[in-house]
Swiss-Prot record:
The gene is LGALS1. It is found in: Secreted, Extracellular space, Extracellular matrix; Cytoplasm; Secreted. A beta-D-galactoside binds at H45, F46, N47, P48, R49, H53, N62, W69, G70, A71, E72. Pfam families: Gal-bind_lectin. This is Galectin-1.
Length: 135
């Protein structure tokens, strides 16, 4: 899946929140947000799948360490609708990342890379970024 946005040197620290708002395509199959050190070292691969890779209305999360993917974690909460504008907030600490979905539901994903700062973000798929903010 090609990335539509790549940002580096973010220097997001523990406790800070990355807020991403964008528009889901009307015919969306899936989209992704990646956070980490770089493309080969991701503490979070966030991949809502409407109908892709055998998953329907499922959020698939993973990490990548030195280019090797970890074990996938699936979330059943799926507040995304094709054609809608959504906002996702992600914060982290030494132990895990907290993802707050558009409906207010939150889940945690382990900080498997033990990153002390998030410097890289990429986004892609059927999602058009409207705003990125740091809180």
């Amino acid at each position: 899946m090609a990335c539509g946005l790549v940002a580096s040197n973010l220097n997001l620290k523990p406790g800070e929140c990355l807020r991403v708002r964008g528009e889901v395509a009307p015919d969306a199959k899936s989209f992704l947000l990646n956070l980490g050190k770089d493309d080969n070292n991701l503490c979070l691969h966030f991949n809502p799948r409407f109908n892709a890779h055998g998953d329907i209305n499922t959020i698939v999360c993973n990490s990548k360490d030195g280019g090797a993917w970890g074990a996938e974690q699936r979330e059943v909460a799926f507040p995304f609708q094709p054609g809608s504008v959504v906002e996702v907030c992600i914060s982290f600490n030494q132990a895990d990342l907290t993802v707050k979905l558009p409906d207010g539901h939150e889940f945690k994903f382990p900080n498997r890379l033990n990153l002390e700062a998030i410097n890289y973000m990429s986004a892609g798929g059927d999602f058009k970024i409207k705003c990125v903010a740091f809180d």
